[in-house]
């Protein structure tokens, strides 16, 4: 169920009335659901632009259309239009399921490692234009990773591996005993910090 505050409904209605298109509503969809970059998208929805499988939420004077593929990701979402302490107004969408839910301990070791890499480690590495990819997880709990982007060839990759990636995986995923780097760092085209760097 998606909750829409009265202030959000009033805000949408004003915007729709400005457009002056009969039957216009608002479409809500999830973009990149189940990933760390997931986001909710709101846009005007002209009746001729609808696919036909949208879920409809009657908001009184207009309809909110929810993309069918997004329904599960947006279940429990709240849409509000609030006045900030500064006096400015802001539309707020809270969608607690949009980025996915952490896997339980009954998930396989590989699934849990991949989840932590995608949802916790890669978002941090992205600030440097980097990422890691899981190559293999052995039955013994040794994780083999390959660095990419700004981490490929970076002079700090060893530190990132030991103090960041390995520590996070060993703390967060029961069963991981070691993390190894399978990257050939000599081939890195645009490292965040060159391996030749000396302060």
UniProtKB/Swiss-Prot annotation:
Gene3D superfamilies: Fe-S cluster assembly (FSCA) (3.30.300.130), HesB-like domain (2.60.300.12)
Any GO molecular function: 4 iron, 4 sulfur cluster binding
Cofactor note: Binds 1 [4Fe-4S] cluster per subunit. The cluster is presumably bound at the interface of two monomers.
Cofactor(s) listed in the protein's UniProt record: [4Fe-4S] cluster
Chain residues that bind [4Fe-4S] cluster: 151, 154
One Pfam family cited in the UniProt record for this chain: NifU
Key words, A-Z: 4Fe-4S, Iron, Iron-sulfur, Metal-binding
Domain of life: Bacteria
Role summary: Involved in iron-sulfur cluster biogenesis. Binds a 4Fe-4S cluster, can transfer this cluster to apoproteins, and thereby intervenes in the maturation of Fe/S proteins. Could also act as a scaffold/chaperone for damaged Fe/S proteins.
Entry's family note: Belongs to the NfuA family.
Subunit structure, as described in the record: Homodimer.
Protein name: Fe/S biogenesis protein NfuA
Species whose genome carries this gene: Xylella fastidiosa (strain Temecula1 / ATCC 700964)
